[in-house]
Regions:
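Short beta-strand/loop segment at the start of cytosolic alpha/beta domains
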Residues: 1-15
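Short leucine-rich amphipathic alpha-helices used at interfaces
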Residues: 2-3, 45, 86, 114
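General small-molecule cofactor/ligand-binding pocket signal
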Residues: 6, 81, 103
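Short, flexible active-site loops
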Residues: 13-15, 48, 121
């Protein structure tokens, strides 16, 4: 699963695409961990833009749980942004929104971690 990223001040927006399931969870976890490492080194928060994710399985939720634990042990912050309706429902039903903050838009997520990052996002 490809992970693109873009930095906005003290935040890095990471944008996966496709399905987060058993078939690609291992690679996603490895790549997301590398992104978390970079955020830790930069002192940046990680915003996981889920707008390109069509589906999340239980294996995908496990990957997100591991990422949340990694962020906590590294004194980093990770938030979820812009999930599609089906993914938002999965996160809510599984109560995963209690593990990681979930925001309706990428801008809202950026504003929650850094007002300066939200301003940089607004400037494009």
């Amino acid at each position: 699963m490809p992970l693109s990223h873009r930095s906005y001040g003290a935040a890095r927006v990471v944008s996966p695409r496709g399905r987060l399931d058993h078939d690609n969870c291992e690679g996603f976890q490895r790549d997301l961990s590398a992104q978390l490492d970079a955020c830790t080194q930069e002192g940046a928060a990680l915003v996981l833009d889920m707008s390109g994710i069509e589906y999340v399985s239980s294996a995908g939720l496990r990957c997100l749980m591991i990422a949340a634990k990694q962020a906590a042990t590294r004194a980093s912050r990770i938030v979820v942004a812009a999930p599609q309706p089906v993914v938002a429902e999965i996160l809510q039903i599984s109560r995963f929104n209690l593990v990681l903050p979930v925001f309706g838009t990428t801008r809202e997520a950026l504003a929650s971690v850094s007002p300066q990052a939200a301003q940089a996002f607004d400037k494009g």
